[in-house]
Amino acid sequence: MSTGHKSLSPSDFVNDENQSVGSSSSSFVPVEQNSENAIQMINENKQFNESILNYIEKSTSSSDIGNNYHIISVFGSQSTGKSTLLNHLFNTNFDVMDESKRQQTTKGIWMAHSPLVSSTLTNGSKSEENIFVMDVEGTDGRERGEDQDFERKAALFALSTSEILIINIWETQVGLYQGANMGLLKTVFEVNLSLFGKSKLDKNDHKVLLLFVIRDHIGVTPLENLAATLTQDLVAMWDSLNIPPELSHLQFQDFFDIAFHTLGHKVLQPEKFTDDIKLLGNKIIDMHDSGYLFKKNYHHNIPVDGWTMYAESCWNQIDNNKDLDLPTQQILVAKFKCDEILNLVYDEFVLGFNEHLLADAPSKSSDTETSIDYSELGLSFMQMRNATLENFELAASKYNQSVYEQKRAALSLKINNKFSELFEIYVKDLVDKYTKSFTDTVSFGKKKLQGNTFHEGITNLQESIFQEFSQNIALISLNGDLEYDNHVKGLQLKLEQMVSKQQIVELNSIITKSLKKLNNGLGKVIVEELNDPKSDTWDNILEKFKSYVDSTVSKYEVGAGEYDFGLGTSLQSNIGAINKFKYKSWVSFHELIHKYISKDNVLNSLKDRFDDKFRYDENGLPRLYQNGHELDNSFNESKSYAMDILPVLTIAKLSDGTEILPDYDIFDKRLRNQYGGASVVTADDQQISIDTDSEDEEEENPCFAEILSESDKAAILAKFKKEINAKFVETKRSIIQNVTQIPYYIYLVILVLGWNEFMAIIRNPLFFTLALLLGAGAYVMYHLNLLKPASIVAQRMIDESIVLAKQKLKEFLLDEPETHGHNLNKISGNKTPPEDESIELDNLDPK
């Protein structure tokens, strides 16, 4: 143990430094020619060197580096190559071990400035920031034996003053407790927490990076697996610390970050060792590298001269702390062995758990309807947990009793946590099953519900499901060790939400069906009334509309202002549903009016009404006007008759002159948001903001009774007048054509010029009769529009006659000479005509 702290002057370290350089000259060869000598920061007698600041100022090119620096320390077992690692990586000149001897080389704590960091960037690059590295005396050395006081304090000092603590271990040490210095780290973490943890409350973003450099990595075990093992060990170790109450909320991740890097074997794989060193150098100097190590919250945020004072103060506090003694070795052994046994039996438990229980757990791909005996399943849970705890008790109960009980409780908690994963799977499966069963039953409505009403049936179904679910889930809860009340409440809440949604669906269905019935009936009434508009048309339509609404509302009214749909919904919801029905009834009324009354429909109605009066008389026979005076009177009368229905079709006004006013302002945006959606109004819907109409404040409010605007009416009248004026002009033109006569002098001209021809026809009865027939036929065909078809038939007859004439001429020219020649041959005794004559006759055949 230390006998006390003593700071040395620079002259006190001269002999030590000379001895170090002398001792290292025979065993150390610089990695690079530009490597820099180191200075002993704390000697083996725990004395702090006050000349550190002078060394820093001399070793840097800038006189004032301020915060532009980084501190890196290395920590690890003795003779594991810590100094060699620093020399190769940072081009420092730390003393290294003679490979022919296994003995302590580094004594105390040494510091050196890194002039160059080895990397793949042009075979090494100078960092933009100054890097100082501290080489800490190795742990577990035979020179100090069981005196571990200095190595613990040195490790604690390095952890408290550095941004990055390099933990140098061999691959074969991963997973070991002492070999990986886990025991020492645990003590250092605990003391560091007690000494410096309170500053974390004021500066909660500061962390230290623990960089594990795994040496002699041959690649059989992936880095990911090694990292997982070390991370798990560190987190577990932190959770077991004696943390002060005021810091109990802080976790390992609040103090430390972890990084990992592997190096090949220096002797057997020299090239890979060098390459791995350079890759690590990239992470230190290349800020664009994905594994860049330095972060802002690692720095202590004090100038370098302040850091030297801070480091000296830390060492004073660490060296003079009387409470730094570690627990007894018996406690350490008990903790280590109990942890080892705990991990062993827990691994066996997990193996059996995965093989026998987890494999049989329900999954998405499995049949969710498979029957499960939850009583038997819960018994198997208990048997497996008890067997695991008995195995731990058998092997670990011989160690320290308090440690054993603590670890047994931890094991029981881990087992329960593992079972909770499976428990959640079965709970989710149960929830899915009962939810599906509930949904299937509810979807059929009253058909499958046991009750007189929907509300009574749904209540009975909920109670049945809650009781069965609670019984099954309690059987697999490890006698209540696994909390399940929240799951029961969750299912209850879920079913209540489903019931609420189904109530809304049923309520909306009632409203929708009622509105559909109203639309069908009211639509027919509107069509019938508009076929023959009268002054009381809108009185009849409004009366029918109100009768439809009142008959629907009265079906569900149970009292003055109270309604019941038999769904178990609240009074507020029922009133909201009735209000919604009434509101949407007026909306449907408005839509039906505009559906059957449009600009085109009104125009057609006016034209039809005008035609009925203008073209037909009281008996329905077509009118034949004899003179213009009669036409003018009929036109004015028909026009007035048609215009009488225009006010009825353009505004919904009762016979007493009042306009139809709806019970709800269907154009109010707030009411549209409240009643116009798909869902039924609930109590929450009353909280809709009244600011929703702010956008329409400047717009003119539309009128329910106004069917067509004044501009629409003007357009209809313009088209109507244009069309009836055209009909008037057409009718008047026909009257003028009928009264128009041929001038008499025309007949005189015809008589004088055609007298001879006329008399020739008159004197010849044949010509006279033929002329009469032809004239009568032409007259008939003209009136029947048959002149063109007749001309086509005549043309075809002429064409056929020409073809027939050609054929007869051909027969005459070819057949008659051949017949005469044949007869002459018989007379002369020749049976066949001469060849030349036959050929000549053949030549007459047309080609």
Swiss-Prot record:
- Class of enzymatic activity (EC top level): hydrolase
Q: Please give, as recorded in its UniProt entry, the membrane topology of this protein.
A: Multi-pass membrane protein
Compositional bias (Polar residues) at which positions?
Answer: 1-22
Per UniProt, subcellular location reads as: Endoplasmic reticulum membrane
Q: Where is GTP bound in this sequence?
A: G76, S77, Q78, S79, T80, G81, K82, S83
Which ranges of this chain reside in the Cytoplasmic compartment per its record? 1-741, 787-847
Q: Which regions span the lipid bilayer?
A: 742-762, 766-786
State a single Gene Ontology molecular function. GTP binding
Lumenal topological segments: 763-765
Could you state one GO cellular component term attached to this entry? cortical endoplasmic reticulum
Q: Which UniProt keywords apply?
A: Endoplasmic reticulum, GTP-binding, Hydrolase, Membrane, Nucleotide-binding, Transmembrane, Transmembrane helix
Which Enzyme Commission number(s) are listed? 3.6.5.-
Positions with biased composition (Acidic residues) = 835-847
Location of the region described as Disordered in the Swiss-Prot/TrEMBL record: 1-31, 820-847
Predominant location category: endoplasmic reticulum
Show where the GB1/RHD3-type G domain sits: 66-297
One of the protein's GO biological processes: endoplasmic reticulum inheritance
Which family does the record claim for this protein? Answer: Belongs to the TRAFAC class dynamin-like GTPase superfamily. GB1/RHD3 GTPase family. RHD3 subfamily.
Function statement: Cooperates with the reticulon proteins and tubule-shaping DP1 family proteins to generate and maintain the structure of the tubular endoplasmic reticulum network. Has GTPase activity, which is required for its function in ER organization.
- Can you say what this protein is called? Protein SEY1
Q: What is the lineage of its organism?
A: Eukaryota, Fungi, Dikarya, Ascomycota, Saccharomycotina
